[in-house]
């Protein structure tokens, strides 16, 4: 086991502070509309250019092990804020640095770190209560576009596209971000329920040009087992053939005699039919088949429920306005299920999302939710170079997270104004001693820091003067760093999601509090690099006869 170094008291805390400052100073240059880019070297490929705080934070690795611990603690603030709210990572980093800096001064002067932390925690609770009071729900498409625009570093094109996508697929709809083939950024909406299973045979195609099978007003047979024997499928085929309407068969697998018979009848024109595999695997497959059944007003024919395929009637079949199937995907549009059943299923899935513990499960449940509630929007991001593409895609993903957060918890004035207004929440906080009161004052001072940094990044205005003027103002009055004017921030479209501001403050205070109450830091002792041993013998290998040279 490697030897360890132990650093106590001020020595350890100061080393941690150096690490915190190095990381925070690299991250905070990206804050606000006047924030700068950071270029990150990569071992392979072109360097990454970014203005995203968490991307910068994740790349910082310091040589000194104790400094590196401080940097990694603050990196955790940025990562956690990004995971929960999707944005606000730079604000969280700036707040963490400010709280730790102010707190460390007081600990060095003899304050009790535990009481300081208690005071900080009480202050944060008071500020968050006030933030929720001043928060207001997002009103319209324009405000969604403004949130997206601010989060994408004032790129109004991205803000408008996200607002349009949300309008088309609803607030619960799935919006995915993909790389475009060309230079144009565009929005594509897939309406209805789409799942990633195509036709089982190209002979089912109805349009040879597009290689698609299009069924108008079809019946939909949903079966959770394999179909290989034609005998069990025949009764329901005869019933649908008599109706004259097409039939889509969704089953775990259709093979052998059953598939061959379907293809032959399709080619002869006896049946308008198409067969696809059921989407998903295991329990998720059962759930998705149930979703399709509810959307189309059908029943999953399952022996577990006592239904048999040979006894199926037209009443078991789902119906839809149209179904389009290509070699990879099937899309069901205008399912004929009842609105009440679909709403009940959506609420059931929402409850499962809240209870889900893994990100993967949550993502899959959200996808099912979107498919039931109206569709999937795809943002295809175009750029001229790969470096620009990666940077733009990261900004779009940030903006998308931020707009979702705004829809969930509402919005507050941006540009650091909401935190300054939320200071009034400290007036009702009860403290037990002077050190806790100092913790309160640390938060009061730290809440000004994001605005100071936004102003500092403009490089033209004095931060203290701006902070004083904003504090004298009321409500949404603040400093718009983009135009360098004082105005109503919400009217100017400078808005932040409440969730982003709240999460940034909570995470910053949590990690800064842990750092302040640290009394010892244990790190691995760096090992001295040993010289490789000399090979035995006096001669140089491969140069025979020279061993005796002097």
Swiss-Prot record:
It comes from the Bacteria. This is Chaperonin GroEL. GO terms for molecular function: ATP binding; ATP-dependent protein folding chaperone; isomerase activity; unfolded protein binding. It comes from Chloroherpeton thalassium (strain ATCC 35110 / GB-78). InterPro entries: Chaperonin_Cpn60_CS (IPR018370), Cpn60/GroEL (IPR001844), Cpn60/GroEL/TCP-1 (IPR002423), GroEL-like_apical_dom_sf (IPR027409), GROEL-like_equatorial_sf (IPR027413), TCP-1-like_intermed_sf (IPR027410). ATP binds at residues 30-33, 51, 87-91, 415, 496. The gene is groEL. Residues 537-550 have a biased composition (Gly residues). One of its GO terms (biological process) is protein refolding. HAMAP family: CH60. Together with its co-chaperonin GroES, plays an essential role in assisting protein folding. The GroEL-GroES system forms a nano-cage that allows encapsulation of the non-native substrate proteins and provides a physical environment optimized to promote and accelerate protein folding. Signal peptide: none annotated. Forms a cylinder of 14 subunits composed of two heptameric rings stacked back-to-back. Interacts with the co-chaperonin GroES. It is an enzyme of class 5 (isomerase). Its EC number is 5.6.1.7.
